[in-house]
Structures are given as structure tokens and as C-alpha cells.
Amino acid sequence: MSYFKNLFNGLLSGLKGNNKEAPFYYWEEYSCMSALVPENYSLTEEVFVNIEALDGIKIKYKKLPHKKTAGKLVISYERKDFEVGFFLGDFPVHEMRHWEQQYFTEENKEKISSVKKSLNIFMKFEGNSQKCYYLQLKLIYAMIPEMVALFDESAKKLLNKKWVELAVKSNLLPDPINLFSIHAVYDKNEVWLHTTWIV
């Protein structure tokens, strides 16, 4: 968690209008995902154009990241408003292999291994978690369809780009199992199941 905690320091404060450090429990409030970006990727106003082209989504406020302040979107979706924060940051891809839960070809793995940065997107879920997860995937794919892969930090899953593409183009909501992971945790001769997710 320390990597994402460091990334969020000061960025959530920019979104919230204060200068406090991001709380360690930020992952309990925000669904956090990181799209692994290809080399020479740049974040431009085009992301807003792509989002505005999505059916059923209306942008009410938009701002690109500036210095140490996260970018911000306020969107209307199914009669609800959602705040979405986003920013580019360095990405420690060597830490992600442990969370690989989908199939990746050797070519996929080579591309992932060469990634140095990610587009990080965080939002609060309001109402139906499946619909919010689907919305976040649609926003991310619209912002960066050329992503190399997607790391869902809240569910601790490294997702194949093709899976993301199929999910956002489907008329069906992702299965609930996609929203969480269950891990076996061992400590002091005891084993228990640990769940990571955002609801």
C-alpha cells in the first residue's frame, strides 16, 4: 500500500481543497486503478473529448492535472454525480507480478515489464458497486485505449487490456467476482482469508 499512499499524498488534498496527507485508509473510500501507459504517452484535453463521446455520461466539470494537483472530473451518470481524480505517476511494475490473475502472453509481459509510468484514476463508488466499477472501466478505457494493462489496486488485480476492452464494450455488467480478490494470509502459524475490494 505504501506506493499508492505516497502517490496520493497531496493529490487528494488538491481534490478536496486542503493540504493534509492522504489518509492510510484512502483505499476504503476510493476505487483506485492504474492504467499502464506506453512510452511517450502524454495527457491532453483529448481525454475529455473521448469521455464526452460515451453514451449516458455528461461532463459537468473538467480539469487536467497541474504540478502536484490531481486532475478532476465531475460527471453525471444515471442521475448521479461522480467525482473522479486522475494523474500521471511513476509505476513500480516489478511489484505487480504478484497480482497477475489473468492470462498474459509473453509479448504482453514484455510490454508490461518495460512500463515506467501509469495514469492513475480514483473515484468514490455511489450506489450499485457493479455499475460504478463498470463506469470506472469505461472512463479509463476512454481516457487511454492504448493502455498496456490495467492494475486494479483496490481489488489487487493486474488486468489484461483485452479483458478491459471486452468489458467496456459489453452491455452486461462485470461479474461481482471482478470487484474483489481473496488471499490466504499466514502469520504466527495461523492462516486466514483476506479480502481486498471496494464497495
Give short role names for the model-derived ranges.
Residues 37-41, 122-130:
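Short, flexible beta-strand-to-coil junctions
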